[in-house]
């Protein structure tokens, strides 16, 4: 049986070295012993001999329950996966002639999204003759930029794409 890292640590008869540094089931260092002695000690207490540090000279082995070790490793991996946050891009849509109160509501939402660690894409949609007043849209995005400058940085500067002007901001 060949050992691959995804199988987990080598255990019992899979350990193919003549001598190992042994740590018993109570965590006490037993010194360097032969593999046969280590296997006998593990069998005595009804546990497995597991290679903990394979790169050491001689390798470090511990007498523990292999099933319990695998369970703890899986649990640790699941915990780290749970703690990782996927950064999403939230979108806030506005018009160039947005009212003061509406702007305040949108700004609050931007602050909330940034506080949650997400990126925010602010989109200004121009309709009809509003395209002639792109400078108003640029001023509005500059205002958003200034109002969020203490908590966010600009990831992509305001740019015009078709009838929309957009800008992306992210937490500092």
UniProtKB/Swiss-Prot annotation:
This is Translation initiation factor IF-3. IF-3 binds to the 30S ribosomal subunit and shifts the equilibrium between 70S ribosomes and their 50S and 30S subunits in favor of the free subunits, thus enhancing the availability of 30S subunits on which protein synthesis initiation begins. The gene is infC. InterPro entries: T_IF-3_C_sf, T_IF-3_N_sf, Translation_initiation_fac_3, Translation_initiation_fac_3_C, Translation_initiation_fac_3_N. Belongs to the IF-3 family. GO terms for molecular function: ribosome binding; translation initiation factor activity. NCBIfam families: infC. Disulfide bonds: none annotated. It comes from Bartonella henselae (strain ATCC 49882 / DSM 28221 / CCUG 30454 / Houston 1) (Rochalimaea henselae). GO terms for cellular component: cytosol; membrane. Pfam families: IF3_C (PF00707), IF3_N (PF05198). Keywords: Cytoplasm, Initiation factor, Protein biosynthesis. PANTHER family: TRANSLATION INITIATION FACTOR IF-3 (PTHR10938), TRANSLATION INITIATION FACTOR IF-3, MITOCHONDRIAL (PTHR10938:SF0). It comes from the Bacteria. GO terms for biological process: ribosome disassembly. Monomer.
